[in-house]
Swiss-Prot record:
The gene is carA. The keyword Amino-acid biosynthesis applies. This is Carbamoyl phosphate synthase small chain. SUPFAM superfamilies: Carbamoyl phosphate synthetase, small subunit N-terminal domain, Class I glutamine amidotransferase-like. Disulfide bonds: none annotated. It comes from Bradyrhizobium diazoefficiens (strain JCM 10833 / BCRC 13528 / IAM 13628 / NBRC 14792 / USDA 110). The keyword Amino-acid biosynthesis applies.
Length: 396
């Protein structure tokens, strides 16, 4: 699928990187980032900006990201746009697939070239393939398992790579949260970015919030802090007893990678106990899916997933449409939602479930990412909604 004959933009030598799909298809290109190989599920992301935030989102653990936008790397990288909280954990995405070579950065905030940044984080990259054709393949056949490999000398064990891609079990049934969750409890007090000041620092708090870290993003924590939450982040395996002993005004269920049904084996009982306590609860992404499991619904693997910063979502309670940022390959099966759990939001792309509210309880969640980073800010109000639920509970 490489078509670089007579193209001066590409070097005239043998490929230095491969993408080997589980069905035996081999895509040849040119390597960037770290050398080596990695196995994962190939998805595509349609965002035109925010590649650093995407590549450091822990929800992408176990995945190889195909960027549909052709110009990736043109604003460089910096330390402020990283979304990973646990820097000792997996870097998020296992590989990156691009149409064109990375250009030199041109942005006043850039501190490092994307290629050097990928090398430093151990992320393998591949450029020079027809990403439109790869995206079309994913849309028609679903997200394939694959191995991405980079060797500067262009020498590969093709048989071994094909076998590894074929034998990898895939994300279904896989609990990846232990790879990304924080190993210990910590507090967070950084607030959202202001154009002329940068990130702020909390000076006062109104609520005590416990955030369960299934792979939480920094901008979620900033927005919680921005609405007056003193946020204590706890590891994913923290018990309900320990959480409730902290006397939280609210509990937050974070985003994260992998199959919610697998993570739910230890997370769902905790969530059920939190709900029973009457504590206001807000979930995002994986947290939303596990809230669904906690009330008796089921989750399902999606055909191509939702990955991008331009996904329209309808709020069925108001009729309002929000443009949202999404990153998920599993979804709550709306047909299995029990009585007492109301569907509040749906995707206008495919009608899949994007929100739940528990009737008569201060508990709600959304499938998409209201914190964006990257993406639009249409849904920032949900953090205010969470704060209002806690305020009402405290004054009752």
């Amino acid at each position: 699928m490489t078509q670089h004959d007579n193209d001066p933009a590409w070097p005239d030598h043998k490929p230095t990187a491969l993408l080997v799909l589980a069905d035996g298809t081999v895509l040849e290109g040119f390597g960037l980032g770290a050398e080596g190989h990695a196995v994962g599920e190939v998805c595509f992301n349609t965002a035109m900006t925010g590649y650093e935030e995407i590549l450091t989102d822990p929800s992408y653990a176990g995945q190889l990201i195909t960027f549909t936008f052709p110009h990736i790397g043109n604003v460089g990288t910096n330390e402020e746009d990283i979304e990973t909280v646990n820097m000792a954990a997996t870097p998020g995405a296992r590989g990156v697939i691009l149409r064109t070579a990375i250009t030199d950065p041109s942005n006043y905030r850039a501190t490092k070239h994307l290629d050097a940044w990928l090398k430093a984080r151990g992320i393998i990259g591949l450029s020079g393939i027809d990403t439109r054709a790869l995206t079309a393949l994913i849309r028609s056949k679903g997200m394939p398992n694959a191995v991405i490999a980079h060797a500067r000398n262009g020498e590969f064990d093709l048989h071994g790579l094909k076998e590894e891609a074929r034998e990898w079990p895939g994300l279904e049934g896989m609990d990846l949260v232990p790879m990304v969750t924080s190993g210990q409890r910590f507090t967070w007090d950084e607030t959202p970015w202001l154009w002329d000041k940068g990130f702020g620092q909390q000076d006062k708090t109104e609520f005590n919030v416990v955030a369960i870290d299934y792979g939480i993003k920094r901008n979620i924590l900033r927005l919680l802090a921005g609405v007056g939450c003193k946020v204590t982040v706890v590891p994913a395996t923290t018990s309900a007893e320990d959480i409730l002993a902290m006397k939280p005004d609210g509990v937050f269920l974070s985003n994260g990678p992998g199959d919610p049904a697998a993570t739910g084996k230890y997370a769902v009982p905790v969530i059920r106990d939190v709900i029973k306590s009457g504590t206001p609860t807000f979930g995002i992404c994986l947290g939303h899916q596990m809230l669904g499991l906690a009330v008796g619904a089921k989750t399902k693997k999606m055909h191509q997933g939702h990955h991008g910063a331009n996904h329209p979502v309808k709020d069925e309670t108001t009729g309002k449409v929000e443009i949202t940022s999404m990153n998920h390959g599993f979804a709550v099966d709306e047909k299995t939602l029990p009585k007492g759990a109301t569907q509040t939001h749906i995707s206008l792309f495919d009608g899949s479930n994007c929100g739940i509210q528990l009737d008569g309880k201060p508990v709600f969640s959304v499938q998409y990412h209201p914190e964006a980073s990257p993406g639009p800010r249409d849904s920032h109000y949900l953090f205010q909604r969470f704060a209002e639920l806690m305020r009402q509970k405290k004054s009752a």
